[in-house]
Amino acid sequence: MREVISIHVGQAGIQVGNACWELFCLEHGIQPDGQMPPDQAGRANDDAFNTFFSETGAGKHVPRCVFVDLEPTVVDEVRTGTYRQLFHPEQLISGKEDAANNFARGHYTIGKEVIDVCLDRIRKLADNCTGLQGFLMFSAVGGGTGSGFGCLMLERLSVDYGKKSKLNFCCWPSPQVSTAVVEPYNSVLSTHSLLEHTDVAIMLDNEAIYDICKKNLDIERPTYTNLNRLIAQVISSLTASLRFDGALNVDVTEFQTNLVPYPRIHFMLSSYAPVVSAEKAYHEQLSVSEITNSAFEPANMMAKCDPRHGKYMACCLMYRGDVVPKDVNAAVATIKTKRTIQFVDWCPTGFKCGINYQPPTVVPGGDLAKVMRAVCMISNSTAIAEVFSRMDQKFDLMYAKRAFVHWYVGEGMEEGEFSEAREDLAALEKDYEEVGIETNDGEGEDEGYEADY
């Protein structure tokens, strides 16, 4: 079996995790207590869902995951929630005091008290696997636990499980909506670590997902539950080929191979289509080419970043439901002819497609309509650099005055780490710029270069 262990860190990671496991259980017909009703059990002999669930002797299905937070409230919600019987009590780990939005607390002081318990638990999960494929990590980079403790966890996983792939779903701070003043510090410090210790990082940003909920689902005031259920659909589509069978299955390590041209350039944009409310879906015919086009719409990107400002290096399209390869090839051919969607010219093919026959499942009482087919796109675009430069500007404004730095230094961090992380990000921005112009046609901003041709 090719198992995957999910690690949910901090409030954002855990709440996204709740939405994901709720959806996975619905998709596999597993009840909130982990049992699979007898009528489902016959259907389940394909066993593919064992990549995410392990089955106990008593016929109970337990998710292969760990929930960690440095303070108890969010984990307690899982302990008392609908799915409390699904998880093994040891998988829900909480500390006593929180990281207080401080990277240094999560990474150094408070984090190191909890890290060994977590790694021990992960070790038990890993021993229970026959062929561990890798880890999915869920966290936010703006807070203290997700950023500081999340990075500590990734660093330790790199040591213990060097060759296993690590995919990270990071909730990135939004341009306008902020939840903490020190977000820029935490983000820059944690990206410094993400650069080295993850193989693929998928950027999600609340503001972008708010806008999608408002625009496409007509929700006036989206809640975190609305957002997380949408994120869960993306994660479900990505992992569907591990959990069900299909025409073109895509492995976790395949993402890496197809999406990451250079080790550092591994920050991905994601989009999902169709995001439609039940009232609208009733009147629309959502063909393969239509959903493919809307996956490339800038407004449907799950991070505030306009791919028209950059070029695509590679793209992974994961279709699910009633889709045949012929339609996919036609849709991709149409995309390639569009002038608005530009690829770097050193990567002429640029598309990796996966098809899975299991149609998307929706949460009863949720906002999304039940549709026959859906697509999730993960793309590597040079435009993501604008997300970093936005963050770096905010970081510079604060760091020039050394504002709030004493909180970090007081927790045992050195000031040099700030400048080191910031330089690393400056180098990353430069990398993205160079990837875009590495060939003959030059880039818009590089006029002198272009004049020669």
From Swiss-Prot:
TM helices/strands, residue ranges: none
Enzyme category, top tier: hydrolase
Post-translational modification: Undergoes a tyrosination/detyrosination cycle, the cyclic removal and re-addition of a C-terminal tyrosine residue by the enzymes tubulin tyrosine carboxypeptidase (TTCP) and tubulin tyrosine ligase (TTL), respectively.
Catalytic activity: GTP + H2O = GDP + phosphate + H(+)
Pfam name, any one: Tubulin
UniProt-annotated catalytic positions: E254
Annotated site residues (Involved in polymerization) in this chain: Y453
One GO term describing the cellular component: microtubule
Gene Ontology BP, a term: microtubule-based process
InterPro entries: Alpha_tubulin, Tub_FtsZ_C, Tubulin, Tubulin/FtsZ-like_C, Tubulin/FtsZ_2-layer-sand-dom, Tubulin/FtsZ_GTPase_sf, Tubulin_C, Tubulin_CS
Main location: cytoplasm
Region (Disordered): 434-453
Gene Ontology MF terms in the entry: GTP binding; hydrolase activity; metal ion binding; structural constituent of cytoskeleton
Annotated positions binding GTP: Q11, E71, G144, T145, T179, N206, N228
Keywords associated with the record: Cytoplasm, Cytoskeleton, GTP-binding, Hydrolase, Magnesium, Metal-binding, Microtubule, Nucleotide-binding
EC number of this enzyme: 3.6.5.-
SUPFAM superfamilies named among the record's database cross-references: Tubulin C-terminal domain-like, Tubulin nucleotide-binding domain-like
Record carries keyword Hydrolase: yes
Assembly and oligomerization: Dimer of alpha and beta chains. A typical microtubule is a hollow water-filled tube with an outer diameter of 25 nm and an inner diameter of 15 nM. Alpha-beta heterodimers associate head-to-tail to form protofilaments running lengthwise along the microtubule wall with the beta-tubulin subunit facing the microtubule plus end conferring a structural polarity. Microtubules usually have 13 protofilaments but different protofilament numbers can be found in some organisms and specialized cells.
Family: Belongs to the tubulin family.
Name of this chain's protein: Tubulin alpha chain
Organism: Plasmodium yoelii yoelii
Lineage: Eukaryota, Sar, Alveolata, Apicomplexa, Aconoidasida
